[in-house]
Amino acid sequence: MMADKHHCLNRQIVPNRLFPEAVHQSAEEYLHLWRAMYSQAPKKPLLRIWDQFSGSQPTEDGCMMSRAPEMRLDNANSRQDSFTKHLDHKVWIPGPYISFTTSSTAIEDLAQMRVAKRGPQTLTVVDPNSRIANGLPVLHATAEMDHYNIRDPYGQLNEY
């Protein structure tokens, strides 16, 4: 598995992906924080269903990595481009994100849709504060779409 060759992301590794390598470069992280902050944490658990066909699956040690954990997100273009691709389910290019929701209804609907086509689904529940304690950002898709002026590929009025 690709994720096996990477260590789980933590608070030492994540800032390296958010800030530029060269000191003289302008960092998007100074302008628009993605750094993990408890004040941004959802009040509900993060929910994700996955199956044998899902791009991000837990490793043997329980770590769930994105398909491109090494991708740099230190400038507006890299964030906008990678997030635009992530939102479009037809684009299967590895990216630095893992999708979660706080909506049990959305998870239930997705599971019912997938089970007929893809078989059994596994539900993973994550405490957002655990992610933040490990230095991992928790992003709100609609807020990021608004900030980076990303068009909703499915016309859902940015209900993510």
What function would you assign to each model-found segment?
Residues M1-Y160:
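NAD-dependent ADP-ribosyltransferases
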